[in-house]
Amino acid sequence: GTTKGQFGGVFKINPQVDDIPDQFAISHEGVKLLILGSIPEGGGGCFCPESTLLKSLLRHLIIKRDEAVILDMEAGLEHLGRGSTAGMDALIVVVEPGQRSIQTAQHIKKLAADLQVKKVFIVGNKVQNESDKELIKNGLPEFDLLGYMSFNTAIIQADKEGRAPYDLDERIKREVEEVLKNLEKKGVER
C-alpha cells in the first residue's frame, strides 16, 4: 500500500499466488490454515494491494486448485465492499439478537447479491432465550437460518485464555453440529 500522507504508488493487479498456500499454510489433519492478516495501524494508507492479492489467491484456490475455502472475515462490510467474496458459493452471516445486527445482515445480503454470492445463510449468536430466537427469525424471514449459538460464558472464558471454546462445553458442540447438519441439508458440503 501507500505510506501515510503519500499518493498513489503502483501495485501489480495480477500477482503470482500459486506458491502461497503450500509455502505459508499451517496444516492439521488435512486442513490448511492460512492467516491473511489485517490492517496494522490506523491511517496506514490504501489497502488495495492486499485486497488484490486476496482476490487473486481466492480465485487461484477455488478455480485452479478446486479447493473448498472457508473465510473467517472480520465483522463488517469491508470485504464485501472490496469484492473479496465475489463468486463465493455461500456466505454465513452471524447475527446477534438486536436491530443493528439485523439491519447489518440485510445490508450484507444486498451486497452479497451484487457480488453474485449464491447463498446467504444466518446463524443466530449470543442467544439467551426464545425471545432472542424469535427476534432474529422474524427480523430476517428471507434468510435461511442454520441454527443458534447460545450466549455462553465458556466462550468468553476461552477467549480470555486464548483457547478454542469447542472442547470446553458439550452445548457448544451440539449447536455447531446442528449448524453443520443444516448447512449440509441446504446443499453445502463439509
Which ranges hold each PLM region?
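C-terminal boundary of histidine-terminating zinc-finger modules
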Residues: 159-172
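Active-site donor-binding loop signature of nucleotide-sugar glycosyltransferases
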Residues: 36, 150-151
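Residue-level preference for the first positions of well-ordered beta-strands
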Residues: 33, 68-70, 164-165
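Flexible beta-alpha connector loops of hexameric P-loop NTPases
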Residues: 40-49
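Conserved catalytic-core segment of NTP-binding enzymes
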Residues: 49-148, 156-157
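Short, basic/glycine-rich phosphate-binding loops at helix/coil junctions
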Residues: 30-40
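C-terminal alpha-helix
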Residues: 175-190
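N-terminal phosphate/diphosphate-binding loop that engages ATP/GTP or pyrophosphate donors
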Residues: 1-29
